[in-house]
UniProtKB/Swiss-Prot annotation:
Residues 65-133 bind DNA. This is Sex-determining region Y protein. Interacts with CALM, EP300, HDAC3, KPNB1, ZNF208 isoform KRAB-O, PARP1, SLC9A3R2 and WT1. The interaction with EP300 modulates its DNA-binding activity. The interaction with KPNB1 is sensitive to dissociation by Ran in the GTP-bound form. Interaction with PARP1 impaired its DNA-binding activity. It comes from Capra hircus. Acetylation of Lys-141 contributes to its nuclear localization and enhances its interaction with KPNB1. Deacetylated by HDAC3. The keyword Secreted does not apply. Belongs to the SRY family.
Amino acid sequence: MNRTVQSYASAMFRVLKDDVYSPAVVQQQNTFAFGKTSSLCTDNHSANDQCERGENVTESSQDHVKRPMNAFIVWSRERRRKVALENPKLQNSEISKQLGYEWKRLTDAEKRPFFEEAQRLLAIHRDKYPGYKYRPRRKAKRPQKSLDADSPILCNQMDVETLHPFTYRDDCAKTTHSQMESQLCRSQSLILTNSLLQKEHHSSWTNLGHDRVTLDTRISADFPFYQSLEPGLSCAYVQY
């Protein structure tokens, strides 16, 4: 490509230097340059097509050795043709599913001749290709589609990020953290309140029991004094 551009530039320089402007000469040079660039483009397109199909250039030049057929392939060759003729509207995937279902329903006696044929083909394949090793072809990785700079999704995302500097995840994390802190504070306050109520209740019961014990002790201590008084005075003293 660089040589073509250089030859074209040198030709134009010679025309301008000689002060001879001939449209025929310029057209001839343009045609020559265009022919070379078009051939290069076609070669590149063919190579790109092979890469997109997953074919290697070095492997395509060599003869690909097929794997020996197994019993199912031997049986499905003729059966696939019959099913395709009987049901022309069926797709290849649907035919394959039907063949797999039919193969499972066959008995061992019905499968035996196809296994024998597969063994015979395997022996022939070993004799023909003694150093054969199965090497599956690698599929070419398709490039992931990236969003264009003018796509509405990307523009909307950029606008949102411009208006709101904090992302959605950060806001959610902060909101969740604040909610957890508030719930923790509430739970701690409830626990503290319950503990204070329990202590107050326990202290009230303790004081009440202590007062009752003190009253009983005082009554038992003053009991001889109550007996020495007259009945009316003792009742009045107790009521007082």
